[in-house]
């Protein structure tokens, strides 16, 4: 899933509009992605992008992780998420979408780089990335605790 999301981000981050779903499916299939992964990813992404139009929900600033989240997200990943919230890069709602995306990576070993990519994808898809100058460079090239 993350490979497909990164591909979409890299292909369409500068575009005003991405192609429709059918065109995306064909393009992703031609790029070598499996149909089941394409459909699951595009379904998750459609939910994410449709939520951007809704009123922001009130989420708690601090989060307690469910047992399955604790199992999937190691200490480094949870610290990265906490750091991004503390640095005001992720608001609580975006944090929930990042966690949702990470949990959808079922079976993968999730690392802090996955958290950073998912953060970029969530902020980009929700139209929030423009609020942060050089966010892509900062997120992908920082050492924990050195993002300023």
UniProtKB/Swiss-Prot annotation:
Pfam families linked: DUF494
Family statement: Belongs to the Smg family.
HAMAP family, per the entry: Smg
Protein name, entry field: Protein Smg homolog
Natural source organism: Thiobacillus denitrificans (strain ATCC 25259 / T1)
Lineage: Bacteria, Pseudomonadati, Pseudomonadota, Betaproteobacteria, Nitrosomonadales
């Amino acid at each position: 899933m993350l490979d497909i999301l990164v591909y979409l981000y890299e292909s369409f981050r500068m575009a005003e509009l991405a192609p429709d779903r059918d065109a995306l499916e064909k393009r992703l299939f031609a790029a070598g992605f499996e149909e089941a992964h394409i459909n699951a990813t595009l379904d998750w992404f459609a939910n994410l992008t449709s939520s951007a139009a809704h009123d922001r929900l009130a989420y708690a600033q601090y989060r307690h992780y469910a047992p399955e989240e604790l199992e999937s997200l190691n200490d480094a990943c949870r610290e990265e998420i906490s750091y991004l919230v503390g640095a005001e890069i992720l608001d609580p709602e975006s944090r929930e979408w990042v966690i949702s995306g990470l949990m959808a990576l079922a079976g993968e070993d999730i690392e802090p780089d996955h958290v950073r990519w998912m953060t970029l994808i969530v902020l980009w898809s929700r139209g929030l990335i423009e609020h942060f100058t050089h966010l892509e460079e900062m997120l992908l090239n920082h050492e924990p605790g050195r993002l300023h």
